[in-house]
Amino acid sequence: MKKLVDRVTYSLLNEAPIALGLPTLYRDYCRVCGSPSRRGRPWKLARGLVESWQIDSRWQRMIERREGLRCGECGSVSRFRYLARVVMDELGAPDPGYGSFADYANSEDFRRLRVAEVNGCGALHKYLDLNPELAYSEYGSEDPAVPSEDLTRLSYGDSEFDLVLTSDTLEHVPDLAGALGEIERILKPGGRHIFTVPAIWDGRMTRRRAVLDGDRIVHLYPPSYHGVWEDRSPDRLVFLEFGDDALDYLRTPGTDIRVRRHPGNPAISVFIAVKAGGPDEAGAG
């Protein structure tokens, strides 16, 4: 009964205000660090990005909450808190002993997994780093301690990882099919690629904004950049804007893919691609 009351309270005081663009009132615990600290303000989308994305005020508010409402303790934004929740659910860690991702990351259940974090997952990174065999990389890294990995040409071996994590990266990759094929290749049978990309679920279809022709970028629409609008570095350029048909673009022949949307904010979506050949599949039928 207490769980039901908490859930109804959370929906009324947190999820409903988010959907309506109102302040949140409920002091909820953070799925990343477990802290009950209050949330910060929504992030503010640049006017140029709002215009290039062609989103209405409702979707603007939801995306601003996706990228904001920072935890006062660990600094995680809404996107990473929901990613943490989905990772725990997918890896079979809803045990009451794992109240947060920080708890789970300290467990033997997590430490025995082979994990690749391709580009940092925000506040999740310091907990992922508790895994002694974490393969962490940043595209274009100049830090000798942090390797650079190109998602279309990963250096890892076949069937190496139980879990691959990417967050808001694939929309910036010119060769999406190549990147997804590489991720599928390095996953073990039954392994999971759990990831986020911005997707607008308002009836629009996925739009390709740019293509790569040899070494030359051809813009099909005016260039659009995520993050700080004024920072027009090449790795922030948007090649794909995902819409209602996002799963069709993110599916590969060897994976089963689905999406989980935050119940109070559909702008917060987490995708789960499971490589075929896992133990559950082998035992089916």
List where the protein language model places each region.
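GHKL-family ATP-binding catalytic core of two-component histidine kinases
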Residues: 155-157, 174, 243
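Short aromatic-enriched loop/helix-cap "lid" or pocket-rim segments at secondary-structure transitions
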Residues: 41-45, 85, 129-130, 204-209
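A short SAM/SAH-binding and catalytic strip from SAM-dependent methyltransferases
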Residues: 162-174
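S-adenosyl-L-methionine-dependent methyltransferase catalytic module, highlighting the catalytic core
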Residues: 3, 14-28, 32-35, 177-284
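A short acidic, Gly/Pro-enriched loop at the edge of an enzyme's catalytic core
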Residues: 151-164
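Short, solvent-exposed loop/turn segments at secondary-structure junctions
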Residues: 35-37, 76-79, 120-125, 140-142, ...
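Class I SAM-dependent methyltransferase SAM/SAH-binding core
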Residues: 106-153, 201
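N-terminal juxtadomain amphipathic helix
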Residues: 12-106
